[in-house]
Amino acid sequence: MRVYEFARNYGMTSKELVAICHEIGIEVKAQSKLDETQLATLSRHICRGKDTNETIETTPKVVKKSREAKTIAYVVTECEPFTSLGELGKTAAAFATQTIKDGRSLIIALPKYKEITEVYGTTMEWLMDLPIKVGSTEARASLFKLVQDSVTYLFIGNDRYFTREEIYGYEDDAERFAFFNRAVLEALPYLGTKISEIYVNDWHTSMIPLILNVDYKYHSFYQKVKTTLNIHNLEYQGWYSVDILPNVLGISRQYYDNGLTRMGDSVNLLKSGIETATRIQLNEISTEQLKLPQMHES
């Protein structure tokens, strides 16, 4: 049994259990495997203060999940503690904490940025490589998994797109995140968990509802899967020329001609998510931004 599994069974976080281990002289990390002696020592320490005649079980009981419980996929470009430039990363972490507290299973999908690889690379489990469509070509996505504090983190790796000094601000951002969006949809069926809902965040992942409707509509894994678009900041909407649809997203220009992705004379990727997601959620910042005159002009 690993540290994070023991922590989950005893209702605590990996960080809390690691601290306890260090207090009693057991040097471990969240991914470390506990031997029988360490398990017994930890169990005695945690159960200290209870009736001394009580039988202490060194193997915690497995808590059966309710049949009603469904797994949520949360697709985002920032999430603490891995990477965060502001509120988006904090919001993702808070969502994870609340979802687990509510007794639901959660998968968070993130790009495997350079800074994440440098800190967490050795603790991740490589799953497989998959070919991902980018326009009329393909790029390879390397899938990695890390379970921490009862959350399954899915990292999408590609050296060309994500081994860079910054997260955003590149001319090919649309291509980078279109690759990430499609890679997530390709990867989820391989995790062996049925998904009930996919949450996406801002324009960087708002392509998922669109791609899902265009290319995965009849995929058995995605039948009855709902999508929620969280809008955190309307200042960034993903404005691009129409060529982005066939050349990057790999979908027909007809989705511009019919108005689904079009705003003015450009493709607006945030709009594509608004038009195709099952539901939309706005935070306080984006709600206030809607009141600004320039938002009505666009």
Question: PLM ranges: what are they?
Answer:
Residues 1-64:
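Charge-dense, low-complexity intrinsically disordered segments
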